[in-house]
Amino acid sequence: MEIERLDEADAVAVDREQADNHGVAPPETRDQQAYRTEYRVTVEAAYTWDAAALELRQAWEAHETKWPSPEDADRDGDRSLNPEANAEVERGCGHIREIAENVITPAMRAIESEDSDRHLIGLEHCLKGMDRIKEKIADAVRYKGRAPEEALETLKDVVRFTFCYSEERYTSGVIEDCQRLLDRGFQPFDRLNSWQAEQYKGVNSRWRDPESGLLFEVQFHTRASFEAKQLTHAAYERLRDPATSDVERDELQEFQRKASAEIPIPPNVSDIEDYSPEQRRG
């Protein structure tokens, strides 16, 4: 969504229209002042990030030229599942899809409708693709010795939702939406505030549907932090690849640090507290 820079001349014109017969503009209300401040902060943050994002995209293109991505077959080896495991995973994914479509997604859309100042993004991708799920499960079977069913249960982001806020509304919005999730009966599993991290910024949380037991992820982003996540996703995937050289790994980490450093920080974001399984048991 493109945001136009506030034009001072337009603001003055509006004030003139509101002036009384003596040419004196009425004083702004507290809500008007807050809106104007919020608008300025949002616009300036957008322009700051947009300029940085352009440079970061160019930097990533240069990285890909220097470090061409190896062919999937050379990089990944055999990531296929045997027929029995494949059928088991497909059955499990079908069950997850049914719960996501009939229970969790309607609840998330209802939560979204309670506040027009933010919205869900990427809803069409809230379910991870079947091929990608199978790749992750094959890795878990191959490298961690897990059974396919166990590997499917431990995947963090098979079902994922993302809320996007303005910088000014971010902190209060996240806190309010977490309460809305609780009010809908979802059980908090964990929450991590990564706004002070070097290579990723945002808040990631997981929740459990009490009836089915299904875990799903809810991420909370600003436009800039979400776009940075998308922009650095390929770097993240290469960092997870054991075949990536140490030299390239250093460059990838530096690229992620640069992207993260350009993201405007929402006010009072430290008020969003972490939540751990240990706290849940306590």
Predicted regions and their residues:
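Long beta-strand-rich cores associated with HINT superfamily self-processing modules
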Residues: 145-282
